[in-house]
Amino acid sequence: AGDASSGFFRAVADGCPITHTSCSAPHRRLTKVSVIGAGNVGMAIAQTILTQNLADEIALVDALPDKLRGEALDLQHAAAFLPRVRIVSGTDAAVTKNSDLIVVTAGARQIPGETRLNLLQRNVALYRKIVPPVAEHSPDALLLVVSNPVDVLTYVAWKLSGFPASRVIGSGTNLDSSRFRFLVAEHLDVSAQDVQAYMVGEHGDSSVAIWSSISVGGMPALKSLRDSHRSFDEAALEGIRRAVVGGAYEVIGLKGYTSWAIGYSVASLATSLLRDQRRVHPVSVLAAGFHGISDGHEVFLSLPARLGRAGVLGVAEMDLTEAEAAQLRRSAKTLWENCQLLGL
């Protein structure tokens, strides 16, 4: 590369010769992100991380070599329009070596008529092939699980990786909370960026909407609306909750899969982690000991967590109603029972 560049560039006065190895740029640690699974979700995540300039190198891993090579080439061919990022790919975990962040999107698809337990067991078998090798190649990495059922598989990844719980995170209800904020913003006719609102607990149908967490411009939304006698009744609240829970199903029913929203959701998590932003996100973390969840129940579910370069830096103690806390504990109990069936 140095010899070729010397044909185009000339050193400044008193500068090193173009080909001199000591003239390289001052050392800066490069950031590497690996994405395991090159399906619709994995590629949306890779594309979003690429366009947001979050990594110097992106490694793609998938079991289908031709599709993988095609996806990598498709991104590489856009190099003139994107930040300078090295894109590598392979079917072997060795390509992920020295990653800072490993995003796992691979997962077994449910067969019609298959039980939830059988699907979980097939996913565990898949994770046994994926997680230990990537953990071995990048022992200091952060592990971000996106595959569903995300809470159980985050637990599986934690057990199989041997990483501390602070470095194993599930995407959890980060996207659910984005949908929540969007729908509240639509109802109030404000920007979603000015709305704070959290969905917590198990990702999916049993996620818990924390109504008291809703604020707009720093003002508690429900109290302000009640004080001004504006409408935000129980029916409206329940309608929003149902729309949040059904959001993914609606998208899948219309286009066959979800991709872009989860891509942006994961990129927001990657930004907080890799750039040490210490922002609070509702993500799947080890929840034992929080909100009455037994210390002996090693379950992962979503709680507002402060994220930085070291992973989970702390979990916010929310002021939940008894009904919200009870629902959270029920989800934890169900997740714990499912995890016990996996024999990890």
Swiss-Prot record:
Induction / repression: By hypoxia.
Catalytic activity from the UniProt record: (S)-lactate + NAD(+) = pyruvate + NADH + H(+)
Biological pathway: Fermentation; pyruvate fermentation to lactate; (S)-lactate from pyruvate: step 1/1
Residues at the active site: 203 (proton acceptor)
KW NAD (keyword) present: yes
SUPFAM superfamilies, per the entry: LDH C-terminal domain-like, NAD(P)-binding Rossmann-fold domains
Segments passing through the bilayer: none
InterPro entries, per the entry: L-lactate/malate_DH, L-lactate_DH, L-lactate_DH_AS, Lactate/malate_DH_C, Lactate/malate_DH_N, Lactate_DH/Glyco_Ohase_4_C, NAD(P)-bd_dom_sf
Protein name: L-lactate dehydrogenase B
Native source organism of the sequence: Hordeum vulgare (Barley)
Species classification: Eukaryota, Viridiplantae, Streptophyta, Embryophyta, Tracheophyta
